[in-house]
Amino acid sequence: MLSIFVTFLGAFLTLIVMRPLANWIGLVDKPNYRKRHQGTIPLIGGASLFVGNLCYYLMEWDQLRLPYLYLFSIFVLLAIGILDDRFDISPFLRAGIQAILAILMIDLGNIYLDHLGQILGPFQLTLGSIGLIITVFATIAIINAFNMIDGIDGLLGGLSCVSFAAIGILMYRDGQMDMAHWSFALIVSILPYLMLNLGIPFGPKYKVFMGDAGSTLIGFTIIWILLLSTQGKGHPMNPVTALWIIAIPLIDMVAIIYRRVRKGKSPFRPDRLHVHHLMVRAGLTSRQAFLLITFVSAVCATIGILGEVYYVNEWAMFVGFFILFFLYVYSITHAWRITRWVRRMKRRAKRLKKA
């Protein structure tokens, strides 16, 4: 319990201490055509998460796997993320650094995708040497999935907490207490940021954003834990379950990249076509969109947990995930129809209230 308290305190104090420093060095987010917030907001959520995570590691050092490699990796991501938040680094440079860290994870930590489980039938789909290449691309993909989903207040924090909670539950169920406690500690380290990001309890005056530094750190940590828990002998979680745990960020990223490429745009060019933007455009408030998307993510994670608990065939879980994926893509590509339907339902609800 002491390590959990120190984790929360370290993360919270970092937000307080770094706030004036961020304003002084220009580490702030300014409103533009994509960002509709009021005023400049400090981009210090990543530093807070790093310090909170570091506090937990220092207190539980002997219980955690490959601490030097993990802490080095997230420190590099934090530094590059802060530079990107301040100066806008090329996405190709960021992807290159992420690839190098993935290679170090494979080479020094022996952490990589060796198999995909029984997603195609009653046999294990082993990847062999191609799994090393897939691991690099998967690492870059997951990092950027959580980076891209960070578009409205609370969303990145909420979805991250859902993923870490699901992982923690499955690790606890399997008796992997070190991984379970770390997963729950990660939630604790996110909470101070999430509270201030949502204006709890100090109001919008003390709002902070996660920034690329934080979102990339979260994405790397999730792929790190998922690889540790889905690969190797006696793995406590099936690979297909990982898809359900990170379903919303992963599917949203793939759907958005597909839509951008289809329109002849760069897949790296930011826009306002993510699911949270479409929900706000349909008439929901940003808080309502945050709660709805987080709820859907929790439902997806629960499906993954239940699949593990009741030993549902992995191929059936994989088919279910693909159905979810195509429903999501259909909704994104037909967003104008859904937007019109939501607005019509809201008008009817208002008329019924008046009546």
Curated annotation (Swiss-Prot):
Similarity comment: family membership: Belongs to the glycosyltransferase 4 family. WecA subfamily.
Organism classification: Bacteria, Pseudomonadati, Pseudomonadota, Gammaproteobacteria, Pasteurellales
Protein name, as recorded: Undecaprenyl-phosphate alpha-N-acetylglucosaminyl 1-phosphate transferase
Cofactors, names only: Mg(2+); Mn(2+)
GO molecular function terms listed in the Swiss-Prot or TrEMBL record: glycosyltransferase activity; magnesium ion binding; manganese ion binding; phosphotransferase activity, for other substituted phosphate groups; UDP-N-acetylglucosamine-undecaprenyl-phosphate N-acetylglucosaminephosphotransferase activity
EC number(s) reported in the record: 2.7.8.33
Reaction(s) the record says it catalyses: di-trans,octa-cis-undecaprenyl phosphate + UDP-N-acetyl-alpha-D-glucosamine = N-acetyl-alpha-D-glucosaminyl-di-trans,octa-cis-undecaprenyl diphosphate + UMP
This protein's UniProt keywords: Cell inner membrane, Cell membrane, Glycosyltransferase, Lipopolysaccharide biosynthesis, Magnesium, Manganese, Membrane, Transferase, Transmembrane, Transmembrane helix
Organism: Haemophilus influenzae (strain ATCC 51907 / DSM 11121 / KW20 / Rd)
Bilayer-crossing regions: 1-21, 39-59, 63-83, 123-143, 182-202, 208-228, 237-257, 315-335
PANTHER family for this protein: PHOSPHO-N-ACETYLMURAMOYL-PENTAPEPTIDE-TRANSFERASE (PTHR22926), UNDECAPRENYL-PHOSPHATE ALPHA-N-ACETYLGLUCOSAMINYL 1-PHOSPHATE TRANSFERASE (PTHR22926:SF3)
GO CC entries: Gram-negative-bacterium-type cell wall; plasma membrane
Subcellular location per the Swiss-Prot or TrEMBL entry: Cell inner membrane
InterPro entries, alphabetized: ECA_WecA-rel, Glycosyl_transferase_4, PNAcMuramoyl-5peptid_Trfase_CS
Membrane topology: Multi-pass membrane protein
Function text: Catalyzes the transfer of the GlcNAc-1-phosphate moiety from UDP-GlcNAc onto the carrier lipid undecaprenyl phosphate (C55-P), yielding GlcNAc-pyrophosphoryl-undecaprenyl (GlcNAc-PP-C55).
Keyword S-adenosyl-L-methionine belongs to the record: no
Pathway: Bacterial outer membrane biogenesis; LPS O-antigen biosynthesis
Gene Ontology terms: biological process: cell wall macromolecule biosynthetic process; cell wall organization; lipopolysaccharide biosynthetic process; O antigen biosynthetic process
Major localisation: membrane
First-level EC class: transferase
